[in-house]
Amino acid sequence: MNRKKNLSMSIMFENRKISNEISIPKTTPSIWIPSQNISKCYKCKDTFSIWKRKHHCRICGRIFCSYCADEWGIIPSLINLTSPPDNNFSLNSILYKERRMCKDCNSQSQFIKKSSLYIYIFTNLPLTFKELYDIRLVNKEWCKAINTILSFYKGVQYKLPCQELTKLEKKVLWNHRFEFSQHFFLMSKCLSSFKNGEKISALEQLILFYNKKITHYDCKKIACRRNCSPSPKIEEILEICSNEIVISNKIARLWLLNNFKLLKSSEIKMIIPWLINLGLKHYSVFYDIIIPLCSSNNNLIYSFFFECDFFMIDKILYYKLTPILNRFLQKLDSNIVKELYKTLDFVKFINENIFLNLSNSKWESQVNNWISERGPVRLPWDSSTVCIGIASEAITVFNSATKPWKIPLIVRNKNGEKIVNILVKFEDVRKDKLTMIVSKFLNNICKGLVDIETYNIFPVYETCGWIEMVEKSSTMYDIKHKYKTTLQNYIMDLNPNITVKKMREKFIKTCVSSCVLCYVMGVGDRHLENILVTKDGKLLHIDFSYILGDDPKNLKVEMKITEDMVNMLGGINSKFYNIFKENCSLAYKKMRLRSSLWYILLSYLNFSLPSIDAFKYTELVIKNHIIERLLPGENNSEASMQIIDIVDRSSKTSWTQNIAEFTHKISNTLREATQFNMEL
């Protein structure tokens, strides 16, 4: 009797239907779902009220009513305990070992307790996923035990880089490591979880195997995520780099360098600060990865040089980075090195002249003399564009709190000459820079759904930065209070040939961009002067001093959707508003697939030196923010319901927002000026 007949006999003796047992349980998010975003019980869908309170399940982290989460039990060690936020104190968690959980999680917990031996055995056996699928047909208990293992394995794919894996999860990944070739996401999870107990030779063998790029298993057989790809994504490479054992290995570093080279140079340019931070932990990363990667591309050369220059403001980092930077410059042509230092001197020269408070005529003579002596100078954020002069008559000092200067630079590139207006702000602009990096990634990831107008930001010191101003744009404050018109009329006046339908279709993209960007970044202090509208009707946010849910007025920070924006879409009951909501949901789904990327990008707030708001943006704060906003691991339907609910809620102007706008208008009237306006 062959194997298939044996399996069939076993199934017959069990006297059960295969279809009811064979499906793998859905993965649970294993995150603490924020209660303020949930209005209905996850199970029975009853609306919460004073009489129907919210309760978290300590395993899946979802929110239920007291009836649907009335089970209590001790959570097995195989299951990751869903931890509440630090500020969420419960006396029961100290007094009792038992934890509240929902009915589904409790039944799973009970099964894991009974079948822990089978789970441990099947986890440690050297079986492929295909063999595990076959063994499930032997009997019910084996089937459920293997399904539990597969459920844990699928759950690993939704964990953030900062979330610790259990021993069982690490074991599953390591046992199946040779099945992950050409599935870069799973390769990254496996390598990033490599632990001290394994031999270095095993790591090197695995790296060499992955380097052969042999595909043995398709995505369906190893239960990959939908966005699985043989090509690396930035967050996947950086997650591997976070493992100290892996990054300390020479073979691994060379393999990582080859994978970095597969990325676009524009993407590498954006993550230079993260690479420098990695190099400061492991100097060999500078020599084996960063210097070879950056020394062959002009834009990367400029980006690395000026990022190092900024990090070196910190005295300790100055001594650490000086030999690294010298080694980097030795690799470059002497003419490129001269150009780098010329640009650095030009930035210092402009800032020094601002502090001298020169007259416009003095400005012109000083800049012209400098350029005539040293020649045209390349811009620090774009080496292909050179500054050839300054339009001194248009130099302006804005009448806002920090008195920023507008410096109009005459520049030349392959498209000819033009004026680029630079706003020199006397405050830390690194949060603005981070937001622009996030915006650029959003444009790539949600292509077709969003259209974010981005601009260059260059931090000079921790108290000064240059911002490239967007041409032909006005604040929504000016449109409403200065021009005395609506957003729709303003755009139509500037674009007389556009139809209302075409205008609204175009506006949907920019409105979705505005909402998802502000939501994922937790952007606060959103008033009408911080939202610009370009000539062709694009919304553009500026001034990102308050992020991750901070707001100077202590308002709840979610999205800024004004009454004018809703009217532009045709009103809350219009077809275009419904398309806008649907596109917000689609963009949100795409963003959630890259949750690890957003976590890694926001980690800049924690490691950037000199420190940004010291001790405020800890790893825990960033992790909790990403979990609250993106719900990694939660199913798409539940997450979509949350984002649509937030869009609907934000579209209705609250009395607190009206008061905030009114006080802002009074403040503006008193100083009789508006910020960052460029007349059309």
Segment roles from a protein language model:
Residues 373-523, 535-540, 545-548:
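Conserved ATP-binding subdomain of kinase catalytic cores across diverse folds
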Residues 529-530:
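Conserved protein-kinase catalytic-loop position immediately C-terminal to the HRD catalytic Asp
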